[in-house]
Amino acid sequence: MGVPYPGQSELVKRKAVASNRLKFNCDYYTQSAEYHKNKKHKFESKKYPGNKFDSNWEVKVYEFCKDHNIPVEYSPDISYPYEYDGKTCTYQPDFLINGKVFEVKGDYFFRINESTGKEEMFCPYRRKEWTEDEYEWRCGRYEAKHRCMIANDVIILRGKDINNLTIEMFA
């Protein structure tokens, strides 16, 4: 193999990605819904302990809703199927707030597509071992997920929204 550890081998890496795509419908276990539901390194609300969140922004939204007696459920039992690359994928939203579905996303997940002039979601993480085709595949999947959100009337909260939360946003 020519590498100190088997996990460093390109062949082993590609087999692992192929296996994860079959089992979890993503390249790495850490991208799977199972991982995010069970991972240890989550954020927690000091004001309302009990839930573990994926980001400080999600904590902020949850605390705002609780502080203002707005019905809120984190990681609700809701999922939306979408197609990408000939496979059915599943999107699970962050919140059900007052009967509406919300997703919290950083601004760094979005860019303007130069050829269409439209905003799209893309993969902001780029690993050196990915080929250009692999990276573009990931970006395409992010945008397919974004289109799924739009098609299902999911409200996307971004930086400007998180920093200016109002009761009216959740009415």
Describe the predicted segments one by one:
Residues 1-171:
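Nucleic-acid endo/exonuclease domains
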